[in-house]
Amino acid sequence: MSTTIEPSRIFTRQQVDDLLTAAINKTLLQVDKAKLFAHHEGRDKVKGIAGDIIEESVLGCKKDSKQEPDILVDGVLTELKTTGMIEPKKKDSPYVYECKEPVSITAVSIPVIVNEEFETSNFWHKLAHMLWVYYWYKSPVTVKLEGYSW
């Protein structure tokens, strides 16, 4: 696995804490410095826009689609995952919040994964160290793109 990380993706834990703390109580639109909402204007749905906004606008990372973990934090390769949190759909749920939808860790290609050892696989490298960023998804139903700007 390649471990060449772009300089914009290298952080200390304190830097990550400071950047994410600064985003608390703000909408995705308010933190969208990369203007991703404007870029996708007119589209009903853009899969992964919340994660892209956190990665590009809050953390300031340059866009990439590499199969390796997203950032390096204090020398540790770390996968960044962003997911919306909602009130539970079931009235008798013991939970205060639940994920809006299932979260994908990585795309699995059968011809590739069968030739990998688990301990050195892209899947394991992503799973080993994960940073979860949650945002409050106010609507009980899926909204169009402009609905994220609450």
State where each predicted segment sits.
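Nucleic-acid endonuclease domains
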Residues: 1-76, 82-150
